[in-house]
Amino acid sequence: VPKGSFFAVVGANGAGKSTMLSLIAGLNTPYRGSVRLFGKKIGKYKESELYPKTVALLPQNPISLFTANSVREELEAAAKAHGVPAEDMEKTARITGCREFLERHPYDLSGGERQRAALAALIMTKPKILLLDEPTKGLDAAYKKELADILKSLCSNGATVIAVSHDIEFCAEYADICALVFAGSAAACGEAREFFAGNSFYTTAANRISRRFFKNAVTNDEVVYLCRKQKENTDGARQ
């Protein structure tokens, strides 16, 4: 996985996607092959080297990550533990959309709100590799765009994001590279646009609908743009 990239992993339930994340995080040991982080076998890392500065994992249900009585206390504890100034903590709360529920108990949050709060806490650890298991679960379309902006910002600052997701549209629009996991192995991998444009099953609805008319159109915005452009060309030819 290239450093600084947003790497998405898709595949059917039970294919091994979440297991892969647990192996990268060092939570489980592979029975074949090996996991290397920056060229070094994960087993050679001391726990203090691995967590949280090298790897951080956001699970599907992050409720077990919370120990404080409010989101604010949770973020303040994370900021203090990792030497993050108060103003940076407030900025992280703002960009992750947590400010509206800072005083609430994490257990009282919706699934999407919990995801945001957990992501805010993990961002402050400044990991080199951020692992996300179904990060868009419970999120509305508007916040998915905000999440993508956050992840892209992390990548531009040198972090590597590896996300497992069933959200094909999200992966197609925002990931740099995408891999398909089947029966515990990577069956395909490539640049996101090429991956989804050349796939029959794991592709976007926009690509399925438009592939007879537009080659390599993957997202809704691309299809709309190409339709408008085609209409303009047709109208121009009639004139």
Role assignments for model-derived ranges:
Residues 25:
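Helix-to-loop junction immediately C-terminal to a conserved catalytic motif
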Residues 33-41, 51:
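Conserved ABC transporter NBD signature motif
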Residues 84-101:
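Conserved ABC ATPase "signature" region
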Residues 105-109, 113:
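Conserved ABC ATPase signature
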Residues 165-166:
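H-loop/switch region of ABC-family ATPase nucleotide-binding domains
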Residues 185-209:
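Conserved beta-strand-loop-alpha-helix hinge in the C-terminal portion
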Residues 202-239:
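ABC ATPase nucleotide-binding domains
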